[in-house]
Amino acid sequence: MSSLSAYRQGHSFQKSMKIFMSGLEASGEFWDITKLVPKFKYILCSFYYLKDDIFQEIKRKSDLLIIDSGAHSFQKGKKVDWVEYTKKYADWIEKNDSPQIVGYFEMDVDNLIGYEKVLELRKILEAKSNKIIPVWHKNRGIEDFKKMCQDYSGKVIAITGFKNEDIKDEQYLMFVKYAKKYSCKVH
């Protein structure tokens, strides 16, 4: 059963799920697309690919935005100064934050630098915004997921779903139900 099917079994879709379109900012046809599409609803952008003029156009045409750190883009062999990149991302967040932006994903690169370092990077981001979205990974353990829901009660959290490596589709409902207990919205 897919995560969508599991979610449907336990929840009504009326006003409960927003689907964010992604990849627009990295498209070579961005300006052509924006000429054809007068309004976007929900957009997820990667900080890694964002250029200021493209961001301003997406922001102008969108109801809501979520910004990804772009950390996953680096997992293809590039050497990165994670602290420097995070500071640059944090400064961009401070400069560009608006009510229209739902949140900003943390630097969830546990597999590269370890969870303790990720927590240090999260502090850099949280010093600039209270809309940082923590991303739970299996290596963090179930107790960390529960603590994350409690600590971020009423906010947006994320559960990694990349290639079903961390949790299986049929397990998502259990995570979503637990997060809902703390009024967390789940990406």
Language model feature labels by segment:
Residues 1-4, 152:
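Extended hydrophobic/Leu-rich segments
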Residues 3-120:
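Non-catalytic, usually N-terminal nucleic-acid engagement modules in DNA/RNA processing proteins
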Residues 49-58, 111-123, 140-144, 164-177:
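Active-site-adjacent beta->alpha loops and helix N-cap segments on the catalytic face
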Residues 92-103, 121-130, 151-152, 178-184:
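A structural motif corresponding to the C-terminal end of an alpha-helix
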Residues 131-187:
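Glycine/Thr-rich beta-alpha phosphate-binding loop at enzyme active sites
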